[in-house]
Amino acid sequence: MRVLLLGPPGAGKGTQAVKLAEKLGIPQISTGELFRRNIEEGTKLGVEAKRYLDAGDLVPSDLTNELVDDRLNNPDAANGFILDGYPRSVEQAKALHEMLERRGTDIDAVLEFRVSEEVLLERLKGRGRADDTDDVILNRMKVYRDETAPLLEYYRDQLKTVDAVGTMDEVFARALRALGK
């Protein structure tokens, strides 16, 4: 099963990605983790990504796409994966579609974790991260709405909405139901 997780910062995608991957026996692929691992290993892509991250810039889509494409070549991803944090734009979604088409496959499901902005603010402020000020959080939500929300329209035929308010286990049960598991 090939599953994408979408939702604003603080919706619980990372937590649910780990649980879903474990339950379904497929890898969780997080672009943040891909960046970290490639940087640590000093790969060509990692060195290039580090230049952008060190400058405080977003890693360009073509480089992110290349990292994801490279990761999808690993044998553990042959039977499926949970993608967390990618794609972030329609441009990246189209690139992902091409990657999967070359492999003769496609996305099976797209889960959107939905949470009100009030709940997100509370969750993010509760994490205690230095950069989680109200202004920064509100800006991240705006960026999500502007950049990532168009993906909801792009994936409308595969999209399943998951109410992400509740305990970790309640949200996990809803996510499994949305996947028909």
Curated annotation (Swiss-Prot):
Family: Belongs to the adenylate kinase family.
Region (NMP): 30-59
Subcellular location(s) per record: Cytoplasm
Binding residues annotated for AMP, in chain numbering: 31, 36, 57-59, 85-88, 92, 129, 140
SUPFAM superfamilies, alphabetized: P-loop containing nucleoside triphosphate hydrolases
Keywords attached to this entry: ATP-binding, Cytoplasm, Isopeptide bond, Kinase, Nucleotide biosynthesis, Nucleotide-binding, Transferase, Ubl conjugation
Protein role: Catalyzes the reversible transfer of the terminal phosphate group between ATP and AMP. Plays an important role in cellular energy homeostasis and in adenine nucleotide metabolism. Has a broad specificity for nucleoside triphosphates, being highly active with ATP or dATP as phosphate donors, and less active with GTP or UTP.
Annotated crosslink Isoglutamyl lysine isopeptide (Lys-Gln) (interchain with Q-Cter in protein Pup) location: 94
EC top class named in words: transferase
Temperature-dependent activity: Optimum temperature is 50-55 degrees Celsius. Highly thermostable. Is half-inactivated at about 67 degrees Celsius.
Subunit relationships: Monomer.
Reaction(s) the record says it catalyses: AMP + ATP = 2 ADP
GO cellular component terms, semicolon-separated: cytoplasm; cytosol; peptidoglycan-based cell wall; plasma membrane
Pathway(s) the chain acts in: Purine metabolism; AMP biosynthesis via salvage pathway; AMP from ADP: step 1/1
Entry keyword Chaperone: no
Name under which the protein is recorded: Adenylate kinase
GO aspect biological process, one term: AMP salvage
Region span, LID: 126-132
Binding site for ATP: 10-15, 127, 166
GO molecular function: adenylate kinase activity; ATP binding; nucleoside diphosphate kinase activity
Pfam families found in the cross-reference section: ADK
Activity regulation, per record: Competitively inhibited by the bisubstrate analog Ap5A, by 7-deazaadenosine 5'-monophosphate (TuMP) and 8-bromo-AMP.
EC code: 2.7.4.3
Domain remark from Swiss-Prot or TrEMBL: Consists of three domains, a large central CORE domain and two small peripheral domains, NMPbind and LID, which undergo movements during catalysis. The LID domain closes over the site of phosphoryl transfer upon ATP binding. Assembling and dissambling the active center during each catalytic cycle provides an effective means to prevent ATP hydrolysis. The LID domain is a solvent-exposed domain that is much shorter in Mycobacterium than in many other bacteria like E.coli.
Keyword hit for NADP: no
